[in-house]
Amino acid sequence: MKFPIETPRKQVNWDPKVAVPAAAPPVCQPKSATNGHHPVPRLSISSRATVVARMEGASQGGLQTVMKWKTVVAIFVVVVVYLVTGGLVFRALEQPFESSQKNTIALEKAEFLRDHICVSPQELETLIQHALDADNAGVSPVGNSSNSSSHWDLGSAFFFAGTVITTIGYGNIAPSTEGGKIFCILYAIFGIPLFGFLLAGIGDQLGTIFGKSIARVEKVFRKKQVSQTKIRVISTILFILAGCIVFVTIPAVIFKYIEGWTALESIYFVVVTLTTVGFGDFVAGGNAGINYREWYKPLVWFWILVGLAYFAAVLSMIGDWLRVLSKKTKEEVGEIKAHAAEWKANVTAEFRETRRRLSVEIHDKLQRAATIRSMERRRLGLDQRAHSLDMLSPEKRSVFAALDTGRFKASSQESINNRPNNLRLKGPEQLNKHGQGASEDNIINKFGSTSKLTKRKNKDLKKTLPEDVQKIYKTFRNYSLDEEKKEDETEKMCNSDNSSTAMLTECIQQQAEMENGMVPMDTKDQGLENNSLLEDRN
């Protein structure tokens, strides 16, 4: 249960962002050693009222955080699973014992009725019901009730009032009258908040005491150059051990001695009481067969008060741990995602840059290899052609060179251009000797251009060549065409956009052609145009 308070209590929370600013003793909060990491949060000694103080401080500062629905549903599912698991375990442990008790009671009732024939089963059931009602009213049906102490004497009534405002509610005694029930309602409404203020104050004092002790322990470990995280863990363990010794172990030993319980029953009662569960199956000072001292029950209630403050501090500390762990987990997950995204971007950029460099290098190497292969093929072709020409006779070599380099084309063109003048100057004997004057004029009139006539003359000349020369010419002609096709395919595969390499290849090709005696196409076309102009003038 949460208790409202007027002012935020002094505390040092695990989470620096959520912690309420409060003035704490300087001894309890020594300066943490800066080691390059985030400061480790300090343990808090707080009670259930701390939750209300934190909520008030957050609402005043406008920084109140609301839990998301997904988180609420997840926690609800976890709680339901936890409840189902607990129910299954309790049923497996307690149901066999309950069945055995039922069988035992049934056998004892049957044996009693068999031994006491004068008692009817209805009378026995009525007696048992009266005993249960008396027990529920707080009167023990065991023994002589006139000699035992009353459940509503001053000590017992004080203890009952303490169980009401502490919300423990053992249930061993309860008001039976209407006036008592009405007063219990009003008493709980005003007494529970009042006890909450008292519990918060005691929690502050316990926090101060334990804070000073923890600060001394941290000072000792800090001199030994122990890491801050280890110091926090050690101080937490010492805090829990000290509380367990003071509020659990020592009271359990006392209850075992006074109440006659076993060690397990004593520890069970202590934990159930300080966690405000209060089943009521074991109650200190509830045994009618024991004569308790008058101060026993008030002392038990004072132990409950201080023990509740300690357990509230422990529960609050556990809640702070879980909250800090969840926030740290979220921050670590966010950092991991950010690092992963940054690493992915860097790897992608490096991969793209590497691929671009490799593509450029491979492209350059392919282009250079294509150029080198083209030059080697041309050089090999020229060497083979020169070797073949060396094997021919001088006459065939001159004819083949004239056909290959285009010199015959120029000489035949000059003869054609000069043919009309020769026909005019020379006599009829020479015309009859050659017998070609009229045929050449007909050829000029028929084709109408010197270029067509030149091509025709070349074809006629090729027909008159010997067969061995024609075969050699065709072989080298096909070889040249194959070389040109291979060069074109290589250029298409390379997809070269570098104009300098193309110009270099073209210059090398033109130079090789000029060395072999071949006339460039531009020069050939220009020569044809000049010859046409001279022919028109004539």
From Swiss-Prot:
Keyword annotations: Cell membrane, Disulfide bond, Glycoprotein, Ion channel, Ion transport, Membrane, Metal-binding, Potassium, Potassium channel, Potassium transport, Transmembrane, Transmembrane helix, Transport, Voltage-gated channel
Region (Selectivity filter 1): 167-172
Subcellular location: Cell membrane
Keyword Signal: no
Annotated catalysed reactions: K(+)(in) = K(+)(out); Rb(+)(in) = Rb(+)(out); Cs(+)(in) = Cs(+)(out)
Bilayer-crossing regions: 72-92, 182-202, 234-254, 299-319
Polar residues compositional bias, start-end: 412-421
Residues the entry annotates as binding K(+) 2: 168-169, 277-278
Membrane side Cytoplasmic: residue ranges: 1-71, 203-233, 320-538
Tissue specificity statement from the Swiss-Prot or TrEMBL entry: Expressed mainly in the cerebellum, spleen, and testis.
Region (Disordered): 412-444
Glycosylation sites: 144, 147
Major localization class: membrane
Site (pH sensor): 151
Gene Ontology CC annotations of this record: monoatomic ion channel complex; plasma membrane
Positions contributing to K(+) 1 binding: 167-168, 276-277
Intramembrane feature ranges: 154-180, 263-294
Residue ranges of the region described as Selectivity filter 2: 276-281
Binding site residues for K(+) 3: 169-170, 278-279
Keyword field contains Transmembrane helix: yes
Family listed: Belongs to the two pore domain potassium channel (TC 1.A.1.8) family.
Quaternary structure and interacting proteins, as annotated: Homodimer; disulfide-linked. Forms heterodimers with other 2-pore domain K(+) channel subunits, such as KCNK2, KCNK4 and KCNK18.
Domain notes per entry: Each subunit contributes two pore-forming domains 1 and 2 which assemble to form a single pore with M2 and M4 transmembrane helices lining the central cavity and M1 and M3 facing the lipid bilayer. The transmembrane helices are bridged by the selectivity filters 1 and 2 carrying a signature sequence TxTTxGYGD that coordinate the permeant ions. Up to four ions can simultaneously occupy the selectivity filter and at least two elementary charges must translocate across the filter to convert it into the open conformation.
Name by which UniProt lists this protein: Potassium channel subfamily K member 10
Taxonomic source organism: Rattus norvegicus (Rat)
